[in-house]
Structure formats: structure tokens, C-alpha cells
Amino acid sequence: MKLSRRDFMKANAAVAAAAAAGLTIPTVAKAVVGETTNAIKWDKAPCRFCGTGCGVLVGTQNGRIVASQGDPDSPVNRGLNCVKGYFLPKIMYGKDRLTQPLLRMKDGQYDKEGDFTPISWEKAFDIMELKFKNALKEKGPTAVGMFGSGQWTVWEGYAASKLLKAGFRSNNLDPNARHCMASSVVGFMRTFGMDEPMGCYDDIEEADAFVLWGSNMAEMHPILWSRMTSRRLTNEHVRIAVLSTFEHRSFELADNPIVFTPQTDLVIMNYIANYIIQNNAVDQGFLDRHVNFRRGATDIGYGLRPTHPLEKAAKNPGSDASEPMSFDDFKAFVAEYTLEKTAKMSGVPEDQLESLAQLYADPKVKLVSYWTMGFNQHTRGVWANNMCYNLHLLTGKISKPGSGPFSLTGQPSACGTAREVGTFSHRLPADMVVTNEKHRQIAETKWQLPAGTIPEKVGLHAVAQDRALKDGTLNAYWVMCNNNMQAGPNINEERMPGWRDPRNFIVVSDPYPTISALAADLILPTAMWVEKEGAYGNAERRTQFWRQQVPAPGEAKSDLWQMVEFAKRFKVEEVWPDELINKKPEYRGKTLYDVLFANNVVNKYPLSEIPADQLNDEARDFGFYIQKGLFEEYADFGRGHGHDLAPFDRYHQERGLRWPVVNGKETLWRYREGFDPFVPKGEDVRFYGKPDGKAVIFALPYEPAAESPDQEYDLWLSTGRVLEHWHTGSMTRRVPELHRAFPEAVLFIHPLDAKARGLRRGDKVKVISRRGEVISLVETRGRNRPPQGLVYMPFFDAAQLVNNLTLDATDPLSKETDFKKCAVKLARVVA
């Protein structure tokens, strides 16, 4: 049975009526399409795009997705979707969808300069096996690596961590979340000893004020923005402040719209801390019971190569050191950040700064701070996170309904996979780290490994992987579920040279021929979204499951299948030294698949637990319920330690649960008695990630950006996204409606800056940095309105690689790239 446009419109109308009446959508759909044998089947899934974690109902028929709706039973989005979410089915069916492995070949053999040629999976794994084994044999575990994703499912990330850190004994595993959430991770760990926000989306309906720091929620998290808009417009007392280096759509609702000079958010936060103290708005009792003060190391560099002049000049490059200080010391430290000084440095009028500070200082105002990439993609991103926590800790506005700091995520499982599973080069599951001997022992015990298997040295982070490929020390490299050739910084100087170096072999697993795929040596076709069973963890600690709903096209396979199947190619003797194998002689002759995935834990759940009519290609390929086995083994890391997850089967019944889940009950606000089961009675608040239960307020100064405009390169460049496209556009640009809505990137520029350079709206313009150049189109109107001296350009357009321009400077503590600040100049392109 086909669903006509008329029927689809009827279904939409019925869905709206059903939502109002409290009926479920599958019931309504049945009424619309009838009880025929090929009627549309509906099932739940979280959205494939940002970290909000909206619920979607997916309609399938005859092995294809034919419809989708916002899930009215989802507490996140309550039946709404953003414009990208409404077109989710179409991301699956681009005309250039990859359906078989492709290898660069010439005259029937692999050739680095050859043409992409279809091959079998067996031959694809043959060449991968050869290249990975050669790298391991010649240079050891540090010669292999993987760049993963905040779009991996929970068990894909967990399998990757086991394969790399245990199997290949290489910590050279990092996710693309390094580019977006690493500063938040380090900030949370530094202040609270545990990662991820303590609050939840319920704060939106409870708060009296919202402050957005470097977050354009209207376009990047539109469903949360709709909830905030409702809160603001239906409650006259509610206020919204928006801070950014340029005006954007979120400014349209702002009561206090603030445009500041890049990097001076650090100054503004220290001013607010000073204001709170000077106006006796400190919650002294809260500080005395729950907070310590520390002074952080300064002049820590910019995460550039050690030979860079800025790194040579830094006194404490990469230092995370700090020393105890008193409240009075902190008071003296922030005293220099006066209203007058802050206004002068930031360019923000004094009355706007004071109005902002009053929101934080007023004890009657419940306030939530939200931030995204403006804070995190920052050479002092960790400091920015710490300084925001300072404001909430000084006032006690934390860990309670309507008040708290909240880092919003940009990918669907940057939290659930990259952070919680621990696919960063320094992390293990449940906030454990490879540098901690006890943590390594815990992982080795749970994974049934010989003691000493997991290396203690931190592996290569995202930017360091690029540098190692260029330097020829990282030689076998697997990129999954991301498009880093387009998304990462400084493409020309630091990434492309390593990828095309004949010493290196690059594998890219992707559903589409992205810039990254086309720069690789081997492309593996990948199943996406509901073509596999999956789990994501969103920004409010909500873990959500979905079942496979359609088969993948052609020979496309999930990332999980690819990694687990590839593990069969390696015997332990080929990857582990004798001293390790001698500790577990029973592993001799076994493959990494046997040791890591057929270990009587991962493979203990039989296929009979999967309904006979339910798709699950991976499980049936391996002969056991692999997703359940991986999840339960992983979940054991956090249970009883404040990272508790519910049993696997519960998630298939729920619209997600926010961890820690204890005795079947989710946790909405962490660290607060009465909400968090890990806070002992009588303590009120306990930040139990720290041994003494106290959070840390850090004294940290303003330090300048790594690169600022000068006489030649006279403009700031900031990069980012637009509503219609997600990241590099590899999915959304294949949706005709989204592509037509915003077909190509433009350079947003102030009209006076354009006029001064002889440029008009629609002109072609060459944007030039010290690292490269790109041609774009001048846009002096529209949704983004930069101040004079700054231009803004989105990075979704593969024909305009804005990251040819960006600098690979990172936060020295989080290793996250600053995509928001570099210097450029413009030149008019004469037709």
C-alpha cells in the first residue's frame, strides 16, 4: 500500500488530533492507512541530529522509511521536530548512497593514487589487515589509530574502545566530540570531579532567567528554544540574556542582547563574580559547606606544535596545575575586573553588563546558563566553563530546579558515547582515565585482560592525530561516522598532507562520498540511523534506545559490525607481547574477536531474546544479541558509582531515562538531597565526584586569543552552523528541501565593512588567512549580523572549505580547537 500525499496530510492532521486527545500515533496511523498487510509500521527512535535528543516516530513500509513524526510521548520535544527533524527520512536515500567497499586501485592492485574501485568486504578487510599489521609490527601500537564520533551508538563507541585500547593496545582513539565538547568535559571534571550537567531540560519550565553564552539556540537547538520561548512569552517576569560576538536569531527574543569582543567573555565572567561579591550576593553558607577555592596556572599556551613561537613563549604550556586559595584571595583576584575595565575591554555598554550581573546576583532569580561552541571552541574553553560554574557556586544557584550551568551538546551521543563510554584518547567508561592505574585495573578486570594490557600514556587527540599522520608516525588510520577532512581545522597545512602521504593508509567508513571519504584510500559503506539497533545519550543525561527498522542498502554494514568483524583478523600473538600472553596463556591462538566480544559476557544473550519479526542484522550475523551484551558489560562500569544505567530491556520500553537510574528511578537534578540518591541524608548538597564532596571555584584571568586581527589580516573570522544544515551537510545537503533553503555558504559581514572594501551583497569575495583561502559570496543582510571587524561563515558547504582558513590552536587542557577566532582579510573577486 502506498501512502499518497493526501493520505500523508490526513495522517498529519490525525496525528495533531491524536496528540491533543492523548492517543498514540501508531493507533492513529492504523486508522489512516488501514489494517493491510503492508501498512505503515511505526516505531520510536531519537533524532539523528543534534544533542537535544528529540523523540521521533518512524514510519516504515516495504523496507523503507516513508514517514516520520515528532513523538508526542517524548518528554523532550512533546511531538515537535525542527526543520531538519521533519526531513529525517530523506537523509537515508541520497542518490549517491554508498553500497559497496571502494579501494583506490590501479592495474588490479591497491595504489595510493589509483581510482576508487568496487571490491568485496573480504578484500577490503584483507588490505586493512595487511596495513594495520604492518604498522603494528614496524612501529608498535602508537602507529595505529581511529577517529570516531559523537554520532556512534553507545555500543559502537564501546566496541571501538575495546578494539583500540585493549585489542591493539593503542590509546590513539578520539571522537569528533573533541572538536565540540572536550572543554566542557574537562571543565566539569575540574570543578566537580564528574562529567555532564547536573540539571535537566525541566529547568526551562522552572527558571526565571536564561543566559546564553556563545549559543544560538534558536537555530542549533530549536526545540529547546521553543520551550524557552514559551516560558518567556507566557511569564512576564522571565528574562533572557544572549551573549555572542555577533547578532543571530536568538537575539530576537533577548531582553539583554550583548555583543562582545572575541575572547572577552573571560573578562565579563570575572566582572560578574566581582559584582556578586561587592554587592554581598554571595551565598556564604553554601560556599562554606560545599566549595573550595583554587588559583589556576596561567600563560598555558595555545595547543600548537611545540615549535610554534606562541608555545615557546608560554611559561606553563599545557599546565592544569592549581594551588589552594581563600575566599578573600579570590575576592582580591576578581577585584580588578571592574565595570569600567570590563566595558572597555569587551565593548559592551556598562548598563548591559550591570543588568546581566544583577540576574546572577539576585537571590530571588532562578537562573540557567546555557552554552555551546562559543564557550567550548575556545583556546581558554576550559577556563570559560570553570568561570561560569564560579558564578553558580558563588550564589548557590546550582543543582536545583530552575538553576544551574548547562552545557548543550551538538551531536546525538556526544554525551552518551564520546563522554560516558569514554572514546577520548585519555578516557575509559564512567569518567575513568587511562593514566590512573586503578582505573586501568578495573577495565582490565571487566574485560578479562592480562594486567598491563591498557597503555597508561594518553593517546593522540584529534589535532595531534593530524600532526602525527603528517609526520609519518601514525600510519594506519580508521575514520568512522564523521567528516573531519571538512570539519577539522587547518586542512591544507595539517590534515591533507598526512592523509595523502604514501606512508599512511586511511580508511573512511561513511554512508556517503564525503570530502573525507574521497581523500581516503579505502571507503567502507555504512548503515545509518534506524538501519541498525542503537542507543544515544543526550545533553540531559537521557539514554534512549531504538530498534533496527529497515535494512541497510546493498552491502552497507554498521560501524559495530565492521569493528567486531575486523577483530576476527587478529590473533593475540600478532598484537600482544609475550609477557602479556603468558599471564593469560588460555588466550594463545585466539582472535581479538574471541577475547573481546565472544568472552562469555558480551555473547551471553541469545538471539531468542530478540522478537522473531524484529530486524537485527548484526546480532543475527554474530549469533547472539551483541548490542545487549556490549551494553550490559559497559553499564557495569558505572553502576553503584553515580553513573548508574537501567537494565538494557527497560530502555526499549521507555522514551529514555536520565542517569543515574537507581532502583528504577531516574535522576533529574544531581548532587542535591531529595533528588539524587547518592547524596546522603542531611548533607543537602554533595559534589561526590570530589573526595571531600566539595566543588572548586577557580581563579583564572583573561588571556588573549592565539590570533587576532592586525594591519594586514584585519578581520576576525568566526565559523559555525545554520539552522537548515547539520555540521558538514553530508546528510542535510542531500535533502532537496533543506538544500534549496540554504544552497551554499555565504560570508556574513557588516554593511560598512563591505562598503569599505568595495563589496556589495552577492559579490564573490576571496577570504584569506595565513593558512589558506576560500571564495564565498558577500551577505550583508539576513539572520547573522556581525559587528564591524568580524565576519561569520558556516562550514556546511563542501565547495567552500572554510577550514582551509582556521588555525589549529586548541585549548591546552581540553585539546579542543578554537574555530571561533582567527584573522582574515578579504579581496574582491573580479568576474
From Swiss-Prot:
Keyword Metal-binding listed: yes
Localization, UniProt: Periplasm
Any idea which positions bind [4Fe-4S] cluster? C47, C50, C54, C82
Q: What is its EC number?
A: 1.9.6.1
Q: Does the record carry Disulfide bond as a key word?
A: no
Query: How does the cofactor attach, per the note?
Result: Binds 1 [4Fe-4S] cluster.
The chain positions of domain 4Fe-4S Mo/W bis-MGD-type read 40-96
Q: Which cofactor does the UniProt annotation name?
A: [4Fe-4S] cluster; Mo-bis(molybdopterin guanine dinucleotide)
**How is this protein named in the record?**
Periplasmic nitrate reductase
Classification from the root reads: Bacteria, Pseudomonadati, Pseudomonadota, Gammaproteobacteria, Enterobacterales
Gene that produces this protein: napA
